[in-house]
Amino acid sequence: MRTKTSVSQEDYLKAIWELLEEGQPPISARLAEELEVTPPAVTAALKRMRRDDLVSVARDGHIDLTRKGRAIAERMALRHQLAEMLLTDVIGLPWSKAHDEAERLEHAISPEVESLLLKRFADKKACPHGVPLRGGFAQLRKQGAVLLSDLRANERAEIICVYEKDAKFLEFLDGLHLHPGTQLSIARREYDETLTLRSSNRTMHLGKPATSRIWVHRLSA
């Protein structure tokens, strides 16, 4: 008999999957920060998920997903992205609000609704924030994506993905008309790593706290 995972377990599994995709070692302290829960709550949740064969925990505290746990996490990640597309493309919700709303909706999407949404958005390759469907940040790396903060003066690039978990950051980018698909050039790179950007006859200055949250593809000069 298949055991149904709880909303809490789905959140934990997706958070672990996202950390792994981003290249960050999943440990209890990082999970507590990511999910805004206490360390004892993480310890108790991991104990239950180990019992249910969803995760494994190494002696050094590194957390990994079992095959069963990864399948659930990837399904939740996909449903999250489908929920974001439904919210932005159909309902018209601003992209800055889509992530938080999708965090709640993803748990209510059934296999039937998932299938219908996949058909509805068959032409889409990524969520509104640019995260590839069925691949996440690992797929971004395979596509040759780099952080905007890595670029040098006189390089050109196209934004392909932005950090989606900070609504204020997304509102900030919106105000600068910086979205996936926007092309820009680096006019200057300062000693403190502030970049002077040019895009559509506009000049703007972005510090590393912003440029380290934007993934781009380099364009030929």
Where are these regions (language model features)?
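Extreme N-terminal segment that seeds HTH/winged-HTH DNA-binding domains in transcriptional regulators
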Residues: M1-E36
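Key DNA-contact positions within bacterial/archaeal DNA-binding proteins
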Residues: P40, S96
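Short, hydrophobic-biased segments on the C-terminal half of alpha helices
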Residues: L46-K47
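A short, conserved structural fragment
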Residues: R50-A58
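Basic, amphipathic "hinge/linker" alpha-helix immediately C-terminal to the N-terminal HTH DNA-binding motif
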Residues: G61-H80
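Mid-protein regulatory/catalytic core that forms ligand/cofactor-binding pockets
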Residues: E106-S212
